């Protein structure tokens, strides 16, 4: 099954400026992401950026890069521009991989693409992993997802969902049974035609409250299929501390 990977990459980051080009084990972070995406078996891997510094960095290691508008407010809008530039067919599967995931397993990139290809009821698919640390349930940086019996998302939230009324009180938990909780992984597969529709929708109130773009899909009545990832990726890199941990993990810190 053929699919395309698009990696949106911005130079400007409030917490870690220039992070796509941050060195990890002698390579820029974005190169690690590209190489893992290529190892997934994708037909094409494209970095989408609005910054010449990132373009030049990708050119140096021979990756494919597309320049996109600096007016985009989200990675999905940047993805949509790439879809138009490539003139992808409506049913072409496109996987959006975050540019700050240098250790993302290639296997789960392929998994989310295959998952969408096998879905007839959803135009979009993503992944989650079980939460094993109760503290993550209350961490707003850990996005939780609840699904129905068939694996379709009911809701994504930074809050503790579902709420365990037997064991939760305000902001802490005791004797939590974590088996009911899943952490959302920020990797998505879409059908190209759906992305074209998505960017025409106005941002939804719940999306703006939670600052979770995927809630726009549920708000407008579409479905997102969520599968359990076959491998749990390391968390992405957002801060200098994250970067130092990544360097140690890569053996150069």
Swiss-Prot record:
GO biological processes: CMP-keto-3-deoxy-D-manno-octulosonic acid biosynthetic process; lipopolysaccharide biosynthetic process
Subcellular location: Cytoplasm
Species the sequence originates in: Idiomarina loihiensis (strain ATCC BAA-735 / DSM 15497 / L2-TR)
Protein name listed in UniProt: 3-deoxy-manno-octulosonate cytidylyltransferase
EC number: 2.7.7.38
Recorded metabolic or biological pathway in which this protein acts: Nucleotide-sugar biosynthesis; CMP-3-deoxy-D-manno-octulosonate biosynthesis; CMP-3-deoxy-D-manno-octulosonate from 3-deoxy-D-manno-octulosonate and CTP: step 1/1; Bacterial outer membrane biogenesis; lipopolysaccharide biosynthesis
GO cellular component, one term: cytosol
Keyword list, A-Z: Cytoplasm, Lipopolysaccharide biosynthesis, Nucleotidyltransferase, Transferase
Lineage: Bacteria, Pseudomonadati, Pseudomonadota, Gammaproteobacteria, Alteromonadales
Gene3D superfamilies: Spore Coat Polysaccharide Biosynthesis Protein SpsA, Chain A
Record function comment: Activates KDO (a required 8-carbon sugar) for incorporation into bacterial lipopolysaccharide in Gram-negative bacteria.
Catalytic activities: 3-deoxy-alpha-D-manno-oct-2-ulosonate + CTP = CMP-3-deoxy-beta-D-manno-octulosonate + diphosphate
Disulfides per UniProt: none
InterPro entries: Cytidylyl_trans, KdsB, Nucleotide-diphossugar_trans
Family membership: Belongs to the KdsB family.
SUPFAM superfamilies: Nucleotide-diphospho-sugar transferases
Keyword flag Nucleotidyltransferase: yes
Encoding gene (name): kdsB
Superkingdom of the organism of origin: Bacteria
Keyword Nucleotidyltransferase recorded: yes
Main localization (coarse): cytoplasm
Molecular function via GO: 3-deoxy-manno-octulosonate cytidylyltransferase activity
């Amino acid at each position: 099954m053929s699919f395309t990977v698009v990696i949106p990459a911005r130079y400007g980051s409030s917490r870690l400026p220039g992070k796509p080009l941050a060195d990890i084990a002698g390579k820029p972070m974005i190169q690690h992401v590209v190489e893992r995406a290529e190892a997934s078996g994708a037909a094409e891997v494209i970095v989408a950026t609005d910054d010449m510094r990132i373009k030049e960095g990708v050119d140096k290691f021979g990756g494919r890069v597309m320049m996109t508008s600096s007016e985009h407010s989200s990675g999905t809008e940047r993805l949509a521009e790439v879809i138009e530039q490539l003139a992808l067919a409506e049913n072409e599967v496109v996987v959006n991989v975050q540019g700050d995931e240098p250790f993302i397993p290639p296997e789960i990139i392929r998994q989310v693409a295959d998952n969408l290809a096998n879905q007839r009821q959803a135009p979009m698919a993503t992944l989650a992993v079980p939460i094993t640390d109760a503290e993550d349930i209350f961490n707003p940086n850990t996005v939780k997802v609840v699904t129905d019996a068939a694996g379709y998302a009911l809701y994504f939230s930074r809050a503790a969902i579902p709420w365990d009324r037997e064991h939760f009180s305000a902001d802490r938990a005791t004797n939590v049974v974590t088996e009911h909780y899943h952490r959302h992984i920020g990797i998505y597969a879409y059908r190209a035609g759906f992305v074209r529709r998505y960017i025409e929708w106005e941002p939804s109130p719940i999306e703006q409250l939670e600052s979770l773009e995927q809630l726009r899909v549920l708000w407008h009545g579409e479905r997102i299929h969520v599968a359990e990832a076959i491998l749990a990726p390391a968390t992405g890199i957002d801060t200098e501390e994250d970067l130092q941990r990544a360097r140690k993990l890569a053996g150069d810190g």
